[in-house]
Amino acid sequence: MNFRAVGAIYKFEMARTWRTLLQSIVSPVVSTSLYFVVFGAAIGSRITSVEGVSYGTFIVPGLVMLSVLTQSIANASFGIYFPKFVGTIYELLSAPISYFEIVLGYVGAAATKSIVLGLIILATAGLFVPLHIHHPWWMLTFLVLTAVTFSLFGFIIGIWADGFEKLQMIPMLVVTPLTFLGGSFYSVNMLPSGWRTITLLNPVVYLISGFRWSFYEIADVSVGISVAITLSFLVACMIVVWWIFKTGYRLKN
């Protein structure tokens, strides 16, 4: 393992966060705070409770997951796309560093930034609603799994994209709708049986459900299923990344 090379990629990507602090940290925190104000205070005051929890408190895990998902994809996709765009990726591919180490550096940095952002948003949520985490270790487990999984997914998008439009297309047209329809603002159990069955095909449901369970011990699906689905998606992303480097897809042209 070439730790110096991995560390160089990791430090470069982390340094980019400080250069774009408003976009990377401040903007997501402010946007999520507006959700708390609108949905938690304005609308939440008119909703008694959801699954025995006040509405403002209920939406906290979903909003944290919303930010972690979107930022994981954005950080990882732009991180690998920019070297492709300027042509420096050829220097990276010809350097004495394995493909695994390249992925580890980029994905590790993207996941770290998303985890830190998630914790900041969680602390911000405590200013608006009372929070109590019943299972902190499970909370961290789901947070890390989600950040790593969707950073890998973002890495795949960054390699696949051949323009800035495509770089934004998957997050805007696929990931954001899946997140909003994944139980961020409501319990899946509130839906009619037909819609509930369709909703359970959404992988984001299992992430949010497991993450919410770590807070309030309430979930739309069992924790075991949530972990299994998340790990399955993680393995699928790892297989796709392996295939990309094995075939050179969108890397050598």
What residue ranges belong to the model's regions?
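Hydrophobic transmembrane alpha-helices and immediately adjacent juxtamembrane helices
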Residues: M1-W137, T141-N253
